[in-house]
Amino acid sequence: MTLFTVATLAEFRAYLGVETGADAPLLHALRAATAHIEHQTHRRLAPWLGERYADLLLHDQRECLLREELLALHACWDAFDQPIPLEELVLLYGSVLHRLDGVFPLRGGPIGAVRVLGIWGCHDDWAQAWRSTDDALSAPIDAATPTLSVADADGLDAALIAPRFSAGQLIRIEEEFCVVLSVDAAANTLHVQRGAHGTSAAAHAASTPIERYLPPAHHVQSCLRLAAFFYRQPLEEAAALPTDAPTPRPRL
């Protein structure tokens, strides 16, 4: 289970104009909003690494139809489990793989005839989807380390936006994805979910740069507005009740 949220806790606090208070109800609303958007759109809003099978197009066996949106192609195998050189494949419209050196061979049927390994997700500008945090690991970590030490947890990132780290954020250390669960700005430490979104937790040396994922701006705004509705709804209902009435539970 991922704890990624499309909008971060810091962005949500700024949106609500709330600087203090408990993190838990805010994160609960952000996670509910993220899950709701994914459920309604049938899309994953964060990148993830994995294998998926693609279906061969019988009217043109140079092409196969992907079942999800592909952001980056890592490897591909045909129906006979033979690797296909990546330079012979072109991604069209995010959902079709076109083969340049011939056709995809058919074996047993077109459904699931091609196996694809890559980064999947929903983003309209994958080339610009990651930005430097202007920070790095202050100490080496192994695959089991849940806490990362950094130079300045609430400093400016490469775009001069602060804080550079916030709960709900997806970060990348070399090839590993991590989700930030909480930030201790005083100690300059991050508590994270390691090996997130299909990647594997690995050892990383001190001074390894850390990047942050940038969801499309319209995804962030949709998440903020929906999370605000989820967050405020029980508060508004409670205000309308008699003082001795129990506080209603959120309807998500």
Predicted regions and their residues:
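Divalent metal-cofactor coordination and adjacent catalytic microenvironments
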Residues: 1-252
